[in-house]
């Protein structure tokens, strides 16, 4: 896709991973993307990660989660991110609660013709929007609770119209919850300021510099939690 540039980084902790992310085609005009962080570590967390990956891979597990079949052309309707999160909550909450787990998530749909990006967040770290024209960045805070607590869903979503050069970044809490030897959190504001400072770089380069900075901040190379970062740059809609 000539009008979109994706970048991602993943660094697993020393335990079995609970972070997953993906970018995929929904149809000729839409792309789906998500990032999920399953609580805890070990086999149970990995099991839920694999199960969620299968659920969100429509060719492997077509159950109407991402699309609803229709009798008339185009014979499907793409589910809004709010609906996808509500369906996952309905299917997984009781299973997760029984195992003492939960997961956080951001799910988004990008219209590759118009540049409209719709996002919904379930307890996950805030997605970061970086404007190319205004030279500013802000967190998209709309959303609802994590999945697995059995809480009522009151999810809010956000739709933004991307301009050429705009960036959106998703990251797991393994980044912002990194801790210095003095006990200070790296924090989401530090991430925002760092990526805004390097907004002229391709995201792949900016992510490498960010991870280098986090490692320097915490005084070690290893992370105590999984670290995953997923970002996109809207280049143009022509």
Role assignments for model-derived ranges:
Residues 86, 161-170, 175-238:
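C-terminal catalytic subdomain
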Residues 1-167, 219-238:
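… and, occasionally, acidic/histidine-rich disordered N-termini of signaling adaptors
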């Amino acid at each position: 896709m000539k009008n979109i540039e994706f970048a991602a980084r993943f660094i697993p902790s020393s335990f079995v991973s609970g972070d997953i992310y993906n970018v995929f085609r929904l149809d000729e005009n839409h792309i789906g993307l998500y990032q999920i962080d399953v609580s805890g570590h070990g086999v149970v967390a990995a099991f839920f990660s694999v199960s969620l990956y299968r659920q969100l891979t429509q060719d492997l597990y077509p159950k109407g989660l991402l699309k609803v079949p229709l009798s008339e052309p185009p014979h499907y309707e793409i589910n809004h991110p709010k609906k996808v999160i509500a369906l996952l909550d309905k299917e997984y909450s009781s299973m997760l609660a029984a195992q003492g787990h939960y997961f956080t998530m951001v799910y988004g749909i990008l219209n590759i013709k118009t540049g409209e990006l719709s996002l919904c967040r379930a307890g996950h770290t805030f997605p970061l929007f970086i404007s190319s024209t205004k030279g500013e960045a802000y967190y998209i805070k709309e959303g609802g609770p994590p999945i697995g607590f059995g809480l009522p869903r009151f999810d809010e979503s956000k739709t933004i119209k991307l301009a050429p050069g705009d960036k959106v970044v998703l990251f797991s809490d393994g980044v912002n919850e990194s801790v210095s030897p003095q006990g200070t959190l790296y924090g989401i504001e530090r991430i925002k300021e760092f990526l805004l400072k390097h907004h002229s770089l391709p995201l792949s380069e900016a992510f490498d510099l960010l991870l280098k900075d986090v490692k320097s901040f915490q005084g070690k190379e290893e992370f105590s939690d999984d670290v995953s970062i997923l970002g996109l740059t809207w280049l143009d809609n022509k």
